[in-house]
């Protein structure tokens, strides 16, 4: 075989020309110890707090503690394959999630990865999960209503776009149900919804997803799920990830509603991570910055001014109390951060008053400015009547011989309590709510038996839609009771009342 020197030199030249000197420079560290979802890493001298680092196998970790000779890292995934001596690389990135309309209708985890089996998410934009809340000048005071579809909430403790309204109460008394109703009520509005499930059972999250799917609400909703079996670091970060998704809509002049279900479990997850990192514990063993943890999250809900597009992010955080103790550490913290609370009570729930909202303890500090005039006109009387009823009810339990005026107030109050009851997943539009409240506060129900009120209400909407459709149309358009609307509605209520009494005789 003849060796051609020219050919060989040509091949070598080609090889040299095509040689690409790829040197990958990365700052690395070594795992000193690992356990309980926390790794201690030696090295990584220039690493920054909240930076992502990469363990072997592509598992990410979040840098939380920067100490003299090591770094405390919360592992955001399965830690069983990570061992002492493993090499850890810096990524130079801060945790980000995909945002935009691509995430609507999807169930994702804290990192934004889909967990619903519907394929990858093709989002055109990602955002950091930790950003600074809008400043004072960037904001505008809350002035537009954000309807929950629940009469008790929209009349007594109204929520405005850009508000933070806490839902607080013991376990299993309908806190999530109130939040889901609020999502369903946004169906024909321009509000996008984010539901953050934090530390919940996977079956509960699947149930919520099924309910939203069934009612056609999933098309404008994203579910961010960090379930009970997920690492504590992911449960702690889930609300921030969901908030970034909601902020995309807020910053683009749109409106979003976010539900944190619930922040008690998020606080417990953060406590777990902090104690494992050996941070000094404070009251109830929570770390010293637990208040800041919640305040920096909830301050991101805001109504922006017109120059910034007038978008809004409304937050409904949920807190679970133990035996109604609202003076515990986390409940008092979140109550002080939010703009009001909806307090749910077990006694009311078991008495069949659902949603079990305690009207006396529930308050909305800024929602009044967002209430439409029509609702204000009926809710003012309603609040007064309810307060008098509660007072008289306690008094009436002792005395049987009551004068006619007191009897009348008790009768009216009992009917108003009945009106405020509402079946689950049946949110009402504003015009329907003000119609039934107008009927109640103006005495149209006083002569009806209590057990007939639910049937009366259901029939009333159908009656007005068929015979007096102009009433709903006018209320929707004018958002206030004019003399003309009042006259027409009073006439309709009189007509329907007579018709209804004949059917129940």
UniProtKB/Swiss-Prot annotation:
Instruction: Name the residues annotated as site: Required for activity.
Output: 362
Q: Which GO cellular component term is one of those annotated?
A: plasma membrane
Highest taxon, organism lineage: Bacteria
**EC annotation?**
7.1.2.2
Coiled coil ranges: none
What the entry lists under Pfam families is as follows: ATP-synt_ab (PF00006), ATP-synt_ab_C (PF00306), ATP-synt_ab_N (PF02874)
Membrane topology reported for the UniProt record: Peripheral membrane protein
Q: Name one GO molecular function term.
A: ADP binding
Q: Where in the cell is it found?
A: Cell inner membrane
What InterPro entries does the annotation carry?
A: ATP_synth_asu-like_sf, ATP_synth_asu_C, ATP_synth_asu_C_sf, ATP_synth_F1_a_nt-bd_dom, ATP_synth_F1_asu, ATPase_a/bsu_AS, ATPase_F1/V1/A1_a/bsu_N, ATPase_F1/V1/A1_a/bsu_N_sf
Residues annotated for ATP binding in this entry: 169-176
The protein's annotated catalytic reaction(s) are: ATP + H2O + 4 H(+)(in) = ADP + phosphate + 5 H(+)(out)
Q: What class of enzyme is it?
A: translocase
Keywords, A to Z? Answer: ATP synthesis, ATP-binding, Cell inner membrane, Cell membrane, CF(1), Hydrogen ion transport, Ion transport, Membrane, Nucleotide-binding, Translocase, Transport
Family of the protein in this entry: Belongs to the ATPase alpha/beta chains family.
Q: Which HAMAP family match?
A: ATP_synth_alpha_bact (MF_01346)
Q: Tell me, what does this protein do in biology?
A: Produces ATP from ADP in the presence of a proton gradient across the membrane. The alpha chain is a regulatory subunit.
**How does the record describe its quaternary structure?**
F-type ATPases have 2 components, CF(1) - the catalytic core - and CF(0) - the membrane proton channel. CF(1) has five subunits: alpha(3), beta(3), gamma(1), delta(1), epsilon(1). CF(0) has three main subunits: a(1), b(2) and c(9-12). The alpha and beta chains form an alternating ring which encloses part of the gamma chain. CF(1) is attached to CF(0) by a central stalk formed by the gamma and epsilon chains, while a peripheral stalk is formed by the delta and b chains.
Tell me what this protein is called.
ATP synthase subunit alpha
Originating organism: Desulfosudis oleivorans (strain DSM 6200 / JCM 39069 / Hxd3) (Desulfococcus oleovorans)
Its lineage reads:
Bacteria, Pseudomonadati, Thermodesulfobacteriota, Desulfobacteria, Desulfobacterales
